[in-house]
Each structure stands twice: as structure tokens, then as C-alpha cells.
From Swiss-Prot:
<keyword id="KW-0804">Transcription</keyword>
<dbReference type="InterPro" id="IPR052833">
    <property type="entry name" value="Telomeric_DNA-bd_trans-reg"/>
</dbReference>
<feature type="region of interest" description="Disordered">
    <location>
        <begin position="1"/>
        <end position="208"/>
    </location>
</feature>
<feature type="compositionally biased region" description="Basic and acidic residues">
    <location>
        <begin position="139"/>
        <end position="148"/>
    </location>
</feature>
<dbReference type="GO" id="GO:0045944">
    <property type="term" value="P:positive regulation of transcription by RNA polymerase II"/>
</dbReference>
<keyword id="KW-0779">Telomere</keyword>
<dbReference type="GO" id="GO:0043565">
    <property type="term" value="F:sequence-specific DNA binding"/>
</dbReference>
<keyword id="KW-0805">Transcription regulation</keyword>
<feature type="coiled-coil region">
    <location>
        <begin position="747"/>
        <end position="835"/>
    </location>
</feature>
<dbReference type="GO" id="GO:0003700">
    <property type="term" value="F:DNA-binding transcription factor activity"/>
</dbReference>
<feature type="compositionally biased region" description="Polar residues">
    <location>
        <begin position="601"/>
        <end position="615"/>
    </location>
</feature>
<dbReference type="InterPro" id="IPR009057">
    <property type="entry name" value="Homeodomain-like_sf"/>
</dbReference>
<feature type="compositionally biased region" description="Basic and acidic residues">
    <location>
        <begin position="761"/>
        <end position="770"/>
    </location>
</feature>
<feature type="compositionally biased region" description="Polar residues">
    <location>
        <begin position="107"/>
        <end position="122"/>
    </location>
</feature>
<feature type="compositionally biased region" description="Low complexity">
    <location>
        <begin position="830"/>
        <end position="842"/>
    </location>
</feature>
<dbReference type="GO" id="GO:0000781">
    <property type="term" value="C:chromosome, telomeric region"/>
</dbReference>
<protein>
    <recommendedName>
        <fullName>Transcription factor TBF1</fullName>
    </recommendedName>
</protein>
Length: 886
């Protein structure tokens, strides 16, 4: 399409040249007649007409007395030849304007077709400029030839007037030759047609002089044909020939650089001529600019780099909203998901949720590599390399978006840190240790309304901060200090398992002796804060413990990796607003446009969640009932954005110093007897009621946490905590060594850690099975022994029964004997009565009977055979008295 446009323009230029040649030929024929008519006029009339022309040309500011000038022009006679010449000139200008209009129509048609073909409009624009400018200059050159004779005729007329009026006021040649600007010429509004014709003739003369000046300045700027230009400046004819033959094309003239000493910058006339030449190009340039602005308004960006920056920096700045979006998605997953779900997402990429999380992490990592291939954590130097230095004053072009850029960097670095700990991004402990303070201790407080997701492309207000980005870090708080020390410990364990360096070298890198100097330099402070002082002291204690560690339990078991992960993600999920926005993030309000019911529900929800300290009693139930979210009034997207969770029936309540002192005093008095402690310090306690809002479970957990703190810190356990059960080693098993690691101490792989946990569970089950088998075997071995014992017991029981039977028999025998003795006594008495002569024999028998009883007692073994024949004894006893009777 551009070739066809060039052909059309060339044809139109050729037609214009042909018309101008014809008009120039006609003007040459009328030249002689014009001089003759001018000489016939009277000197007075000629003087009045010439004064009117010169006054109209030399008045730069504008003719203030237009009425006087109009009267002079009306009274002055006008030659018909001059009128015809002026009419031909106006016709020529009209034809030129028509040709320019045709070229404009061709250009607009070409731009429409080009935009339909998805081609840039600048190509057609440049083609138009390169072709149109010669078309603009060529008629001007021809006009110089056309007006050359007219210009020479005017001085002759002026000379005749000067000769005729020598006694009157002389007219200097400089005033006669002084041109007037195009703007001044067209600013004169004369209603008479003759005045307009005279002004048009003078404008052609002024335009010729302006073009001569532009050509001369161009030759001086390019340092070409200087001598020739100087000669042309002295000789008018030579100068015209130079203008015809040596004038360059319009495109090169406009695109050339005007030197600082050029007359174009000092002469109003030349500046006006230069402006008139470039006016048509400016029209097309402004039209294309309006078209491009209308197109870009449909393609907004949150942040737009200036067009004069290098293309690479423009790409990095314009891509920040994309990087911010990906980092925000990763952080939302961490903030809204429980710890176990996060571990499952990172360790199970085969599932649908795990594959989605893996793709999101990969996309985030790929986008981040645009900024740096080597450094995992980004700074402002990666966004604008060579322009923006970390810790230095922010460049003025970035100040309107300074807080937006800094908040994006914080999101990206925090998401990178968490992904590295999960093992989804390969980053070693070295980078985590070096960047911990930058990520978890923000210094500047940012406004959440300046987030890239909330900004528009036309918001260019100044965003200032307390200090330059990256100049310093914030204060180290207690939770951050605990995480920092645990991170250093995990880095030491990983480096020791790699086995490439000694303990002393690793500890000197991770826990240096001049750690306090490093903390003060990062914060630009002269003194350490109390938390930092405590942190330095704990680091020294941990260093001695790790250096002299000789216990049988491995360090990887003593300081478990999953315990550190749980503490890390719990802290991030609770303080994610502070990590991104600083202190202003804690009081951040919802700035989105919600439904009418949303704000009321959010106020009720936040009002209930901001009362965690109101507990009813030691039962642990919350006194304030949590608000219920109505799903019929609130949108699902609004509930997700507000992170509304179901409130738990019991809220955690922070321990006060008074409660901690009471618990310590109670442990010193009674030890870990929680019911007794509540009797002394609970509701209606005998000593005080400091623990009236605590339960036995809370007391036990608090005491265990105290004991774990001393164990992890390597400190001596106080006497009042020695009776408390539990410790760091509860529920832990020995872990297998991770595969070979580098000296950079890589972060443990999540899948490997889970496999190790499964192996531990399998080992535990196998041990339980072995114990059960051993128990069964021991039972089987004990069965015969039990049978023997049972037999022995049965025998013993039988013997006891026999003894009891014997005792019973003996008792029966004794009773029988006593009965027999009584009977015998009765019989003896009867016999005594009947036979009184025999008393001596009875006495002897009575004496013999106790002797027999004594013999029976002395010889118990002889009683058994006697018992077997009781009848026999009776017979003997009966026979004895019979014998006595005889």
C-alpha cells in the first residue's frame, strides 16, 4: 500500500510542477507590461502605494491603526496587470491547497487499510513525511523564482521615489528589505479586496526570504559548501541558484538537528517560516497520537514504565503486577490453609490440588527469573538495574509507585522463603539465613491502599516512605528471634550431615561472635534492643551446646525440622499483614466495594474475634458468643476475601505476668499437682485467685512449654519444672540421613521427610508385632510351669484335706473314750455298792487308765493301727473289768 501511495504522490507533484511552469511562463510575459504601467503612474500616487505596502510588511507586532491604513489603500490606484498577477498567485495557492487535501485523503485511506492489516501506523506516517515534505518545499522554491522579478522591481520603484523625494524623509534599504512574518501578515484583517491582494504579494516575498534563511542555516549546520553559502549570501542571484540546486530534501531538513547558534532560535521570522513548514506534519502526528491514546485507554496497566526507559527495564516494571498476583496467590494458600494441608499440597504433586499448587509455584519461579537468574530474593536493583540502588535515594520517576513496588518485593520474597522451606523451590540455607531479617523484619510502614491490585494507570500521586528501600530493617521481635535461632540451628544440622566442613567453621559462619555488630549495622543503630540482646545471648548458649553436643540422641531428632516448619507457618499465617505492610497492616480495613450486608457482617465478625481475653471461668469456654455468618446475605467470594472462618467455642487467652508468677509459685509449693494448684490459686483459692480463669489442661500445657523452652535453649531446667512430664523428645523417632548435601546446606526435601515418617510408622508397627509375638512365646513357655504349679497346689490341698480328716477322727475318738470312761465309772460305782470288799482293785484300775492315756499321747504313731480296729480296743477294755471281777 505504501508503494501505491508514493506513486500517487509523485503523479500529483508532477501535475503541480506543470501548472507552476505554465503560470511562471505567463508571469514572464506580463513582466514588461507591468513595468511600463508602473512608470506611467504619477510619482505621488506611486509613493502612497509603496508606503502602504512597506508599512504592511514591516509591522511585526500588528497594525494598530487599521482604519488609517484602509483609507490609504482605498485612495491608491491599482494597476490591472498587478491585479491579474495577484489573482494568478492566489489561484496557484488554491491549487496547491487542493493537492495537499488530496494527499491527506490518500494518507487517511492508507492508514485505515494498514490498521486493518495489523501493521503499525508509524510506517505509513514516515512514508508520508518523506514524500510530503519535498512536495511542500518544491512549490516554495518555484515561488522564489516567480517572485524574484517582483522583488527586484520593488527596489527600482523605491529608488525612483527616493530620487524624486530627496528633500523629504529618505527610506532606508534595510526597512524596504525587512520582511514580515507570515503570522503578522495574516493577522491584518482588511475588508477591501485590493488590500488583501497586496498583502498576498508581500507574503510571497516574505516566504521567499524565510526559505533563503532556512537553507543557509542548514548548510552551516551540516558543514557542507560553506564557501558557496557565503558567496550566495553576498550575491542574490548566486544564492537563488544555490537554493535551487543545493537545497536538500524536506525530510532531511526537518529531521536534522538545529545547532545551538542557529538563527532559527533567535529570529522570529525564520521561526515562523519553520513552523509553517512543519505544521502539516504536526497535524498528522497529533492525529496519530490521539489514535494511539484512544487505543491504549482500552489496555490499561496498574503500573506503566516511561517510554524513554530501556526496553528491558520497561518489561521488568510492566511485569510487576503479574509477579505480584502470583505471589499473592501463594500467600493466600498459606494464610487460609492449615499446616497439614500445606504439607499435603507440597508433598503430593500427583493429586489435583497438588498439581495445581506445583504449576502455580513453577509459573511464579519462571516469572521471577526475568529479574534474576542467580539471586533468589529480589531487590530494587533487579527491577531497574543501573538506575535504582538499594539503600539510596529513590529516582524521581519511581517515586509515584515506590510503596507499590516495595510491597510487591515483600510479597515475592516472603513467598520465595516459604516455598524454599517446603522444598518446592531449590534454595539453600545460606540464602535463607542471609535474607531472614529483610523478609521478616520490615522497616517502612506502607499504606495497603497503594497495592498494585488497587492502583490504576492514572494514579501518579507521590508515595513516600520513612527511609529508602532496603536501607535498613526493622526491630527484631521475640517470635522472630525464636524462628531465626531455630533456622540457624537447622542450617547447622544440614551442614553437619553434609560432612564437608568442621563444626567450628560452620558455627563461625552461622553463629558468629560479632553477631551484635551485624544486627546494629542492619538497623543503623548504635545500641541493641532488649530483644536483640537476649537473642545474642541465646545464640552464644546454642553455639556452645552444638559445639559440645555428645548425647546419644541425634541433633536432627533433638531439633525436629517439622516442628520448625509448624512454628514458621503458624507465625506467617497470623502476621502476614504485618510482614507485607508493616504496622499499618495490623489495622488494615476492608476497602473493597461490598454488598450492603457485607460491612455489617464483617463488623460483627471482627468484633467477636477481637475479644479473645474474655473467658468465663476455668472451664475454658468463651464468654462472648461468636457471630454466625449468614450465607444468604453474603457472597461466597466476599467470604473468601474476608477470610471468615468458623470461630471456635474457646479462644486462647494470653498469659499475664501475674498468672505466670502464680503458676511458678504453685509449682514450687506443690509440684505438678494441678487440682491442688487450683485449690490454692483458682476460684476462691486459699492463697489467691490469680489462676481462676485457667483449667488443669492449660496449667499442664504451660508448664510443658516452659520445660521445652529450657531444653531447646540448652539451659539448665529449674527445680520447679523437673517434676513436669514431657519434653522435646516426646513422640519423636530417629530420622534417616538425607541424601548427600552440598556445603550450602540445602533445605530438607518434603517428600523425603514424609517417606521417613512413613518408615518410622512401619518400624513402630513392626516393633509392636514383635513384642506381641514375644509375649505369646513367653505365655506358651509359662503354660507347663503353670500346670506343674496347679498340680502342686492340688496335692497340697489334698494333703490339707487329709489332715483335717485325721483331726476330726481323733476328736471323735477322744469323745468316745470320754464316754466310755464315764460309763466305766458308773459301772464301778455300781459294783462298789454291790461289792464293797474290792476297793483296792478299782483304785488300781483307775491308776492304770491315766497311764494308758499318757502312753497314747507319747506314741501317736501307734494310734493309727489302733484306730483301724476300734472294736478290738473296746473288747480289751471290756475284758479287763471281767478279769478283775474274776
Amino acid at each position: 500500500m505504501s508503494d501505491q501511495l508514493e506513486k500517487d504522490i509523485e503523479e500529483s507533484i508532477a501535475n503541480l510542477d506543470y501548472q507552476q511552469n505554465q503560470e511562471h511562463h505567463e508571469t514572464e510575459q506580463d513582466k514588461d507590461k507591468e513595468h511600463q504601467d508602473v512608470e506611467k503612474q504619477s510619482s505621488e500616487e506611486e509613493t502612497k502605494g509603496i508606503e502602504h505596502v512597506t508599512d504592511s510588511n514591516t509591522d511585526v507586532i500588528g497594525v494598530t491603526k487599521s482604519q488609517d491604513t484602509e483609507e490609504v489603500i482605498e485612495n491608491s490606484p491599482v494597476d490591472p496587470q498587478l491585479k491579474e498577477q495577484q489573482e494568478s498567485t492566489t489561484k496557484m495557492s488554491l491549487s496547491e491547497r487542493d493537492l495537499v487535501d488530496e494527499i491527506d485523503e490518500l494518507f487517511t485511506n492508507s492508514t485505515k487499510t494498514v490498521t486493518e492489516n495489523n501493521q503499525p501506523s508509524e510506517t505509513n506516517k514516515r512514508a508520508y513525511e518523506s514524500v510530503e515534505t519535498p512536495q511542500e518545499l518544491t512549490p516554495n522554491d518555484k515561488r522564489q523564482k516567480l517572485d524574484a522579478n517582483t522583488e527586484t522591481s520593488v527596489p527600482t520603484e523605491l529608488e525612483s521615489v527616493n530620487n524624486h523625494n530627496e528633500q523629504s524623509q529618505p527610506i532606508e534599504p534595510t526597512q524596504e528589505r525587512q520582511p514580515s512574518t507570515t503570522e503578522t501578515t495574516y493577522s491584518i484583517s482588511v475588508p477591501v479586496s485590493t488590500a488583501n491582494e497586496v498583502e498576498r504579494a508581500s507574503s510571497s516575498i516574505n516566504e521567499q526570504e524565510d526559505l533563503e534563511m532556512i537553507a543557509k542555516q542548514y548548510q552551516q549546520a551540516t558543514n557542507l559548501e560553506i564557501e558557496r553559502a557565503m558567496e550566495g549570501h553576498g550575491d542574490g542571484g548566486q544564492h537563488f541558484s544555490t537554493q535551487e540546486n543545493g537545497q536538500p530534501s524536506g525530510s532531511s531538513l526537518i529531521s536534522s538537528i538545529v545547532p545551538s547558534d542557529s538563527e532559527l532560535l533567535n529570529t522570529n521570522q525564520a521561526y515562523a517560516a519553520y513552523t509553517s513548514l512543519s505544521s502539516q506534519l504536526e497535524q498528522h502526528t497529533s492525529a496519530s497520537a490521539m489514535l494511539s491514546s484512544a487505543t491504549l485507554s482500552a489496555l490499561p496497566l496498574s503500573i506503566i514504565a516511561p517510554v524513554y526507559l530501556p526496553p528491558r527495564i520497561q518489561l521488568l516494571i510492566n511485569t510487576l503486577p503479574t509477579l505480584d498476583n502470583l505471589a499473592t496467590q501463594l500467600l493466600r494458600t498459606v494464610a487460609t490453609s492449615p499446616y497439614q494441608k500445606i504439607i499435603d499440597l507440597a508433598s503430593n504433586p500427583d493429586t489435583s490440588a497438588g498439581a495445581t499448587y506445583r504449576d502455580l509455584t513453577s509459573l511464579f519461579e519462571f516469572t521471577k527469573r526475568l529479574y534474576s537468574e542467580d539471586d533468589p530474593f529480589l531487590t530494587v536493583e533487579h527491577i531497574a538495574p543501573g538506575m535504582w540502588k538499594e539503600g539510596e535515594e529513590t529516582p524521581s520517576i519511581f517515586k509515584p509507585k515506590q510503596q507499590s513496588i516495595e510491597s510487591t518485593l515483600r510479597k515475592v520474597n516472603l513467598a520465595t522463603f516459604l516455598a524454599a522451606t517446603l522444598g518446592t523451590m531449590e534454595i539453600g540455607f545460606f540464602y535463607l539465613n542471609e535474607s531472614f531479617l529483610d523478609v521478616f523484619c520490615p522497616s517502612n510502614n506502607l499504606d495497603p491502599s497503594n497495592a498494585l491490585s488497587n492502583l490504576g494507570g492514572y494514579q501518579n500521586g507521590l508515595q513516600s516512605t520513612d527511609s529508602p528501600v532496603g536501607a535498613r530493617v526493622g526491630k527484631l521481635l521475640k517470635p522472630q528471634a525464636t524462628l531465626y535461632l531455630d533456622l540457624k540451628t537447622q542450617a547447622y544440622i544440614s551442614a553437619i550431615e553434609a560432612g564437608e566442613r568442621s563444626k567450628e567453621e560452620i558455627l563461625e559462619d552461622i553463629l558468629p561472635d560479632d553477631l551484635h555488630v551485624y544486627l546494629m549495622s542492619r538497623r543503623n543503630a548504635k545500641l541493641l534492643s532488649p530483644t536483640e540482646t537476649d537473642f545474642v545471648w541465646r545464640c552464644k548458649q546454642r553455639k556452645e551446646l552444638l559445639l559440645n553436643y555428645t548425647e546419644e540422641t541425634p541433633l536432627s531428632e533433638q531439633y525436629d525440622w517439622f516442628t520448625f516448619l509448624r512454628d514458621l507457618f503458624d507465625y506467617v499465617s497470623k502476621n502476614i499483614a504485618y510482614l507485607i505492610w508493616g504496622k499499618m497492616g495490623k489495622t488494615m480495613k476492608n476497602r473493597r466495594e461490598d454488598t450492603p450486608h457485607t460491612q455489617e457482617l464483617l463488623d460483627n465478625t471482627t468484633g467477636s474475634t477481637q475479644m479473645p481475653n474474655q473467658l468465663s471461668s476455668s472451664s475454658g469456654q468463651a464468654s462472648s458468643t461468636p457471630s454466625v455468618v449468614d450465607p444468604n446475605k453474603m457472597l461466597v467470594s466476599e467470604m473468601r476475601e474476608a477470610n471468615i472462618a468458623v470461630p471456635k467455642p474457646s479462644q486462647r487467652r494470653a498469659w499475664s505476668r501475674e498468672e505466670e508468677k502464680a503458676l511458678r509459685h504453685a509449682l514450687e509449693l506443690k509440684g505438678p499437682h494441678w487440682a491442688t494448684i487450683l485449690e490454692l490459686f483458682g476460684q476462691g483459692g486459699k492463697i489467691s485467685e490469680a489462676l481462676k480463669n485457667r483449667t488443669q489442661v492449660q496449667l499442664k500445657d504451660k508448664a510443658r512449654n516452659w520445660k521445652k523452652f529450657f531444653l531447646r535453649s540448652g539451659l539448665e531446667i529449674p527445680s520447679y519444672l523437673r517434676g513436669v512430664t514431657g519434653g522435646v523428645d516426646d513422640g519423636k523417632r530417629k530420622k534417616d540421613n538425607v541424601t548427600k548435601k552440598t556445603a550450602a546446606a540445602p533445605v530438607p526435601n518434603m517428600s523425603e521427610q514424609l517417606q521417613q515418617q512413613q518408615q518410622r510408622q512401619q518400624e513402630k508397627q513392626e516393633k509392636q508385632q514383635q513384642e506381641e509375638q514375644q509375649a505369646q512365646q513367653s505365655e506358651q513357655q509359662q503354660e507347663p510351669q503353670q500346670e506343674q504349679q496347679q498340680e502342686q497346689q492340688q496335692e497340697q490341698q489334698q494333703e490339707q484335706q487329709q489332715e483335717q480328716q485325721q483331726e476330726q477322727q481323733q476328736e471323735q475318738q477322744q469323745e468316745q473314750q470320754q464316754e466310755q470312761q464315764q460309763e466305766q465309772r458308773e459301772e464301778t460305782q455300781q459294783t462298789e455298792q454291790e461289792q464293797p470288799d474290792q476297793p483296792q482293785e478299782e483304785q488300781q484300775q483307775e491308776k492304770e487308765q491315766p497311764d494308758q492315756q499318757q502312753q497314747e499321747k507319747e506314741q501317736p504313731d501307734q494310734q493309727q493301727p489302733d484306730q483301724q480296729h476300734p472294736d478290738r480296743q473296746q473288747q480289751e477294755q471290756i475284758q479287763q473289768p471281767e478279769s478283775s471281777d474274776k
